[in-house]
Amino acid sequence: MPKFYCDYCDTYLTHDSPSVRKTHCSGRKHKENVKDYYQKWMEEQAQSLIDKTTAAFQQGKIPPTPFSAPPPAGAMIPPPPSLPGPPRPGMMPAPHMGGPPMMPMMGPPPPGMMPVGPAPGMRPPMGGHMPMMPGPPMMRPPARPMMVPTRPGMTRPDR
């Protein structure tokens, strides 16, 4: 009868039966070995990505970012389209949307941020306070369960 070899633990089990494998795979040392294996694997993947990116940058395949170096003397960098600024040639200045004037140097809130207080022209809700916004946005669960990759030598996944 063939023995079962666990690549994570680098050991043979006494015999190849589902109960022995299940007991082994639920053990503390096996779980630590699996965790260590995948931790090392992730570190190797990250280092590989860093090395590839560095090599591509040194070969000139990746251009430097536009704001990595200071602009040349006398150069004016236009503001991004989402930020207020003086109108550019050929552009009409944006009219204000009928609300109260903005505080100087404040500007509208960034996209995705809610202003504090009621909207212009709206009264606060009954009770006198605004409802609290929930904490950080929740991530939705993946569309299907994620599968843990198996290594060579592991004949069947744990159940």
Swiss-Prot record:
<keyword id="KW-0687">Ribonucleoprotein</keyword>
<comment type="similarity">
    <text>Belongs to the U1 small nuclear ribonucleoprotein C family.</text>
</comment>
<dbReference type="InterPro" id="IPR013085">
    <property type="entry name" value="U1-CZ_Znf_C2H2"/>
</dbReference>
<feature type="modified residue" description="Phosphotyrosine">
    <location>
        <position position="8"/>
    </location>
</feature>
<dbReference type="GO" id="GO:0008270">
    <property type="term" value="F:zinc ion binding"/>
</dbReference>
<dbReference type="InterPro" id="IPR036236">
    <property type="entry name" value="Znf_C2H2_sf"/>
</dbReference>
<feature type="zinc finger region" description="Matrin-type">
    <location>
        <begin position="4"/>
        <end position="36"/>
    </location>
</feature>
<dbReference type="GO" id="GO:0005654">
    <property type="term" value="C:nucleoplasm"/>
</dbReference>
<dbReference type="InterPro" id="IPR003604">
    <property type="entry name" value="Matrin/U1-like-C_Znf_C2H2"/>
</dbReference>
<dbReference type="GO" id="GO:0071004">
    <property type="term" value="C:U2-type prespliceosome"/>
</dbReference>
<protein>
    <recommendedName>
        <fullName>U1 small nuclear ribonucleoprotein C</fullName>
    </recommendedName>
</protein>
<dbReference type="GO" id="GO:0000395">
    <property type="term" value="P:mRNA 5'-splice site recognition"/>
</dbReference>
<keyword id="KW-0863">Zinc-finger</keyword>
<dbReference type="GO" id="GO:0042803">
    <property type="term" value="F:protein homodimerization activity"/>
</dbReference>
<keyword id="KW-0597">Phosphoprotein</keyword>
<dbReference type="GO" id="GO:0005685">
    <property type="term" value="C:U1 snRNP"/>
</dbReference>
<comment type="function">
    <text>Component of the spliceosomal U1 snRNP, which is essential for recognition of the pre-mRNA 5' splice-site and the subsequent assembly of the spliceosome. SNRPC/U1-C is directly involved in initial 5' splice-site recognition for both constitutive and regulated alternative splicing. The interaction with the 5' splice-site seems to precede base-pairing between the pre-mRNA and the U1 snRNA. Stimulates commitment or early (E) complex formation by stabilizing the base pairing of the 5' end of the U1 snRNA and the 5' splice-site region.</text>
</comment>
<keyword id="KW-0694">RNA-binding</keyword>
<dbReference type="InterPro" id="IPR000690">
    <property type="entry name" value="Matrin/U1-C_Znf_C2H2"/>
</dbReference>
<comment type="subunit">
    <text>Component of the U1 snRNP. The U1 snRNP is composed of the U1 snRNA and the 7 core Sm proteins SNRPB, SNRPD1, SNRPD2, SNRPD3, SNRPE, SNRPF and SNRPG that assemble in a heptameric protein ring on the Sm site of the small nuclear RNA to form the core snRNP, and at least 3 U1 snRNP-specific proteins SNRNP70/U1-70K, SNRPA/U1-A and SNRPC/U1-C. SNRPC/U1-C interacts with U1 snRNA and the 5' splice-site region of the pre-mRNA. Interacts (via N-terminus) with TIA1 (via C-terminus); thereby promoting spliceosomal U1 snRNP recruitment to 5' splice sites.</text>
</comment>
<dbReference type="Pfam" id="PF06220">
    <property type="entry name" value="zf-U1"/>
</dbReference>
<dbReference type="GO" id="GO:0000243">
    <property type="term" value="C:commitment complex"/>
</dbReference>
<feature type="compositionally biased region" description="Pro residues">
    <location>
        <begin position="63"/>
        <end position="92"/>
    </location>
</feature>
<dbReference type="GO" id="GO:0000398">
    <property type="term" value="P:mRNA splicing, via spliceosome"/>
</dbReference>
<dbReference type="GO" id="GO:0005681">
    <property type="term" value="C:spliceosomal complex"/>
</dbReference>
<feature type="modified residue" description="Phosphoserine">
    <location>
        <position position="17"/>
    </location>
</feature>
<keyword id="KW-0479">Metal-binding</keyword>
<feature type="region of interest" description="Disordered">
    <location>
        <begin position="140"/>
        <end position="159"/>
    </location>
</feature>
<dbReference type="InterPro" id="IPR017340">
    <property type="entry name" value="U1_snRNP-C"/>
</dbReference>
<keyword id="KW-0539">Nucleus</keyword>
<dbReference type="GO" id="GO:0005634">
    <property type="term" value="C:nucleus"/>
</dbReference>
<dbReference type="GO" id="GO:0003727">
    <property type="term" value="F:single-stranded RNA binding"/>
</dbReference>
<dbReference type="GO" id="GO:0003723">
    <property type="term" value="F:RNA binding"/>
</dbReference>
<keyword id="KW-0007">Acetylation</keyword>
<dbReference type="GO" id="GO:0030627">
    <property type="term" value="F:pre-mRNA 5'-splice site binding"/>
</dbReference>
<keyword id="KW-0862">Zinc</keyword>
<dbReference type="GO" id="GO:0015030">
    <property type="term" value="C:Cajal body"/>
</dbReference>
<feature type="region of interest" description="Disordered">
    <location>
        <begin position="62"/>
        <end position="96"/>
    </location>
</feature>
<dbReference type="GO" id="GO:0003729">
    <property type="term" value="F:mRNA binding"/>
</dbReference>
<dbReference type="GO" id="GO:0000387">
    <property type="term" value="P:spliceosomal snRNP assembly"/>
</dbReference>
<feature type="modified residue" description="N6-acetyllysine">
    <location>
        <position position="52"/>
    </location>
</feature>
